[in-house]
């Protein structure tokens, strides 16, 4: 409707042109069933904190050259949001996070969207907490022992980014970038299971000790800029 025409025709192009912004992508998120990705896996845990907004249907990713792009004094992004409060009032029940990259791992399809060259055609973003010091260390070790090696060989994956937050509820974030999500896909997780490399991780399953933001992870296809 009129909001999408304004968002795609005016606001997001202006955001992409703001000082310090590298690229912007708007994604239509796919609903996922409330069951484990594979039989026998732990059930994903979500926060029940009423202060955390529960919207999930759309994600706008904005890549900046530094956190100053979003948090520095007198930045263009703040000014743009302040100038468009009427249009942005349509963004109900939404939440924001500012992340920095902890680790970037290229996948087999890296050539499709080289680093820094724009938003991927499809993506999955997760935001979550590991609530104890010990669990945060477990999480860091698991990513390095199992998930990062799999990203490098997972079908259709451009790259994976592990992130840490500057603002927002979640301490941890991940952004998995892909060439596509098929008509029956709602997650990249089955591809990571396919890509097992005999890692023999001896620790607990990651879902046993992380708490996701509402609806996280969110997987979707890019709707702006059009694929």
Which positions does each model-derived feature cover?
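Macromolecular interaction modules
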Residues: 1-227
